[in-house]
Structure formats: C-alpha cells, structure tokens
Amino acid sequence: MENNKRGVVEAKGIKSHYFQTLANYVSNNLELLHNNPKQANSFAASVFGSTAPIDEKDLLDLLVPSDANADALAAGMDCCLLLGEKYRPHFDAAVQQLARLGRTHDVATVIDDEKKFTALSKKTKLKKTDEAKILQAFFKIHSTEDEEKFEAISELCQLDLDFDAYVFIKALTLENEENQELVETIKDNLVEAWNKSNPLLVKLLLEGVKEQDPVDKFTYLLLQPLTEATLSDAVNFIVEKYSAELPDEGDASLVVRSQLGCQFFFLVTRTLAHDQRELAKLVQTLIPRPVRLEVFPGLQRSVFKSSVFLGHHIIQIFMGCEFCSIQSIKNTMFSAKKPFQDWSFVGLAQDFECPWRRLAIAELLKKFSVSVVEKVFDNPVALIPQHESDNEALIELVTNALRFALWIVEFYETETNEKSIKELAFLDHSSKTLLIESFTKFLQGKDVKDQDHLKRIIDALEKSRTQETKSNLEYSREEIKTKMPSSSSAKAQVLHGLNTSAAAGLIVPSLSLLEIPVDEVDSTSHLTTSKDIGQGVFVKAQDTVTEKQKEAPLVAQQTAFHHEPQTATLVPPSPNEESMAAESISTDGWDSPTKSVVLPLDDMILEEEERDALKPDSVNSHRSEETTPVPEQLPQETSERVTSPPPGERSRTAWGDGDATPMILATPTNDYKVSGFGGAKLAKGFGTMGSTGGGFGGGGGGGSYGGRGGYGGGDRGGRGGGFGGGDRGGRGGYGGGDRGGRGGGYGGGDRGGYGQRGGYVAGGDRGGRGGYRGGGGNF
C-alpha cells in the first residue's frame, strides 16, 4: 500500500496540514462559531476563545473523523501523536481505518521502535522537499519537552502553517504571559493572510466567540438551523401570542397582530430560501383556523400553494445562478439545474386565468418580501442562520426574485407591452440572461397555452436586455443643454440684440434676484443706439422702422359690460343628512375613532357663514368682473395717437363715473418684462406687490388691481403711487400708470388719475379730474 502524503491544503483562506478537518469546519461555520458557540463544535469554539469545556468526542470528530479522506485522516493521526499519550489509542484505531482507504502511515511502523524512529527522523532531515519539512517539524515537536514545545511549534510559521501553530498552542494551553507577544505575532500573520479573502474569519479571530447572553426561547428557536422541529416550535409560539390578541379589537392589538402575521410570512420565506418548500405547507397547517382566517384573508388561503410554488421557483433560479455573489450559499446549498414543478400541474396556470386570484397571489408575494425587509422580530434574525454574514446580500437577492415573480403576476398577458418591459429595469443583465435560459428550458414539454405564457415572459426579458431603458430622471448632456440654457447663452442672446420680453436685458441666471436697471428702454421696440444695461453688457441693434412711417389710427372702442354679481346662497341640509352626520363615527369618514373628533353639523355651517362674511364686496365684484369679455385689440402697427375728449364727454364705463373700486391682487408671476415705466423682473416699492411693477425697475405700489403705489406705480394699481401712477388706479402719482398709450406729461397713465382717473402730472384717460400738467391719455 502507498504511504501517506503530507502537504499544505487550503480551505477558504485557511492553510493547514495537521488540522485539515478543523479548517474545513471553521470556514463553513463562521456564523455559528461567532454568534452561537454553544451549538458549535466545542473544540473549534475553544480555539477561538470559548471558555466552555471541550467535549472529547468533538475533538476526535475533527482529528480522526469516520468519513475523512486518506490525507486528512493521516494528518489527524499525526495530531494524535503530538497532543499526548492520551490520544495514542485513537491513533492505533485509525491505522486500520487508513488501511481500508489503501494507505499506510509511515510513523505507525516505527513509533514503538526507538531506533527506527530516530533513523526516520535523521533521514527526513536530509531531504529538502516540502513534505519532508513538514515531517521534520513533526519529529521536533514530538521530541521536545513541554517547556520547549512552544518554540518548536512556532517554527511551523516558517512553513506557512500559522493556523496549525495557533491551534496547537490553544490545544496544549501553551499560551502564558511570557509568550503572549509571540502569540500576538502569529495572530497578526493570520490577520494579514485572511484580511482580504475572509474578513469574517478575521473578526472571529480578533473578537472571539460571543459568550451569549441568555436569550428568550423564541429567539433561540429562530437562531437554530431550519428543521421541521424548530419550525414547528416557532410557529406554535407565534400562534400562542396571536390567539391571546384576538379578543382585543383596539389599535394596539391590531398592530401586534400585523407584526405577528409578518412573522409567519418570514418563516414561509425562510423555507423558500432554504429550498425546503414542503415546510412552507407545514406553516399554514400548524396555524389554527381562527388565526388563519386573519393571516390569510379571502382568496389568499386558496392561492397560498400557488404563491409558494411561484416564489420558490423564482427564488431558486436566483439562488442557484452562477452569477450569485453569495459564494458560500451557491456552493453549499443550491443548484441552478434542478427541475421545477409544472405550473399547470400545481394549479398555478389556472390561477393566472382569474384576475382576482392573481391579485391574491400578488398580495402574498408582497407580504413575503416585506417580512424579510422589515424588522419583524425583537432581535436581529438572519434569513438563513448559517449565513448571517451574507444576510444583506441574501435579502436583496430574495426580494429581487420575489419582485420578478410579482411582475409575472401583475403583467399577465401584457408582458411585452412597453410599460411591462420598463418595469424589468431593476434586473441586471446577468439576471435577465439567467432567467431567459431557465425559462427556455422550463417551457420544453409544456402544453401550448403554457408555452405561450412562458414565451411572452422570455420575449419581454430579451427586449429588456437588448434595449436601453432610461429613467425619466436621467438626461443626456445634450438634453440638459436644451432644457436648461446656461447664463452664458442668455448673455449671447442679449449681445445679439434680441428684443423679446423674455430675453431682453436678461444676463443673469434665471434663479438670481439681481435687478438690471434699464432707463426708459421699451422692450417691445427695437433699439436705435447702444445701451449699457449693466454688468458690462451693451445692447446694440438697428431700428427697422423708418422715421417717415406713419401710425395708422386706432379706432377700437372698448365696450363696457356690466355683470351683476350673484349672491351665494347656503342650502340647509336635509333631515337625512343631519341624521347621517350624527351617526358617523368621525368627520373624515374613516373607522378610526381614536384619530378623529366629531364636528357638529351646526358648527360647520356657522364656520362657512363666518368665512363668507369676512369677504369684502369688492371680491364678489371682482369675480363678476372676471367674466367680462375683453374687446379684441388691433395690431400695434395700425395704432395712431388721438386726442381724448374732455372729461365731461367721456363715456361711462363698467366702473361708473370715476368709480375707483379696488380689485383683488393678482397672483405674482415671474414676468421678465423690461420697459420704461412698465413691468420689471421683480416689483419692489412701498405698496403691495403686484403682478408687474412700474417703471424704474420696480413698482410698488400699485400692484395689480389695488394697493398704494410707490416710485413707479404698478400696472392696474389702485391709488397708484408717485412717478408713474397705477393703471386703473385712483389717485395716480407723478406719471400715470402703464398702458397709457404714450400720453402727455410725465407719462400719463390710462384709466389712472387723481381720485377719479386723474393724474398729478398727466391726467389719465377715462379718469375724473385731469392732472395738474395736462397731457391727457388716450380716449
């Protein structure tokens, strides 16, 4: 038979020769060792800091396991000889076990013969192979006394066997104050080796196992690996708490029952992620009928099986994918090539035909997803206890799988629509490829109707994979330039002499409140000379209107309309309405008495009357005036200046003889109009802000339909202020309001004036008293 061979093996970053089985166990049970050492192998836990006594059976299971391969068994036999005479019987027993595997142990034939043992040791020292070096270390450790063993064991680090050296030190309890610094050096070597490949192992090495505080029974059950026994105990515990809450219909009880219901769905989702679908059925059967009627209302009880089969199918596709980043899960638990149950056979295809059953399936899939995303337990619980370190990645994978399952249900028969395809944007390219391959294999052998459904799913995935779907909130660089012109582009427009009211004089960003004064430059006409409009920008343009061109007469006559405001009437409620209001639980119509207060019907009527009483008559007048049609004005190029008739001959208007009825303030707008005495970018002054301010960049007072004007009375302002009284305002100021039609004096406003459409310096037209210095306006 062949002699045993020695060499360094690696298990997920852990290099070892003597403790190969231990290295494999640790790499596969990191979470268990870190969070629940009492449930782990006691010898492995003691290596990482557990103070619990070591069970000899646990140690032997790691040294000479019954199912080990020949190399691992031979390495464990070396350990039995190095750990002391008490393990010699186990070494002898393993010789026969190794022989059955077709191997012999080279030390077993010389262990009882000192001469042969020494001769083998000397012969080994002459060899330079890695295998010989490992055997040399074995002879040195075996031959040294206890006080010298630490140094002999430390030499294993030169062979890249730092893990074996650390385990020997722990197993033989060689660590003390004198060699503490040397032990820390060995740990540093391990940290450096594991830092990139296995960070959780580094955490376990540095922090040690958690000597768990006592936890409640329920949390203890949730931390155990999933079995039928632990699942049954957990379900029964939740049922007991749920049943105690059933008699109470208060809000607090409803919240508790909602949380407990999510705990049921968490256990169901855990079975699907664990690839133990049949245990999901156990969850439903263990729940008694009164509780089940609430947890699975309506059709959800009937379609629970279909929801479980669909969720399990898609989750397992994601779990077993070769692109799965959770390597430990992919390698140890799942396979992407497993067969799945036919959807028609399990009734899922029939449920797809009914929209109400599809709706119930969708609700259950949403509950599955919520149960793993939200914190449904008092203490943190991983979806798969053995893989707590990968819990976040695992939850993301499961929720994506459930989201795709929900897509299949919600977009049944509309899978290839544009909206349906856009909903698949949450899947990455590799996931779509995997799903296409899986469903392509799955549809083989199905009937025609099932094949049509699966082909629509595949077609939608292929279209989503090939076409670039862009989010509504994403724009290309060119689109951004088109939708949001920069300040530099606005400046360029000004420099080229653009005269539109939106662009003229605008050389600052659109969000800036900086005002640029423009002295008596009308934005509606062309500039004949260059103008400095601020910020070092000059506007230069050619006047396209010749001086000899005459203006056509303006013959439009505005017609006055009068509309009587309608008085609002309050219709008293009927007796039926009063009784319904009295019987209602709350004013908002919801069955939530703890969150609403009943408001008596009489109080509601009184409140409405008070609000109507506070409204001035002018408001009602304004409402009726808003319906007055405005005569169509002739184009500007046909207008001609005409002399307005004397005040006595002026026709009455809808406002009466000089009636200066105030109007409601209009909503301020962002009108970037720049003109001599007209609108400006931001109305500022002494009065109420109007829709457009007066000249000199600001007008204040005289906001639209009311307010006392400031230095440049606003358009249509009441009691227009100085230097440009408001249009349609009473008491116009030094210059009448805008829309004056080029009146005389300082700019007499139209319909403005002193008291009754007059004007201090340019009587407005249609006004009562004329201004002090004439210059009457149009009409």
From Swiss-Prot:
Compositionally biased spans, kind Polar residues: 584-595
UniProt entry keywords in alphabetical sequence: Developmental protein, Differentiation, Endonuclease, Hydrolase, Lyase, Nuclease, Oogenesis, Repeat, RNA-binding
GO terms of molecular function: identical protein binding; lyase activity; ribonuclease T1 activity; RNA binding; RNA endonuclease activity
Basic and acidic residues composition-biased segments: 612-626
Enzyme category, top tier: lyase
Reaction it catalyzes: [RNA] containing guanosine + H2O = an [RNA fragment]-3'-guanosine-3'-phosphate + a 5'-hydroxy-ribonucleotide-3'-[RNA fragment]
UniProt cofactor note: Does not require metal ions for catalytic activity.
Enzyme nomenclature, EC number: 4.6.1.24
Location relative to the cell: Cytoplasmic granule
Region of interest (Disordered), ranges: 563-596, 611-661, 718-779
Keyword Translocase: no
Major place of residence: cytoplasm
The protein's name in its UniProt record: Guanyl-specific ribonuclease pgl-1
Taxonomic source organism: Caenorhabditis remanei
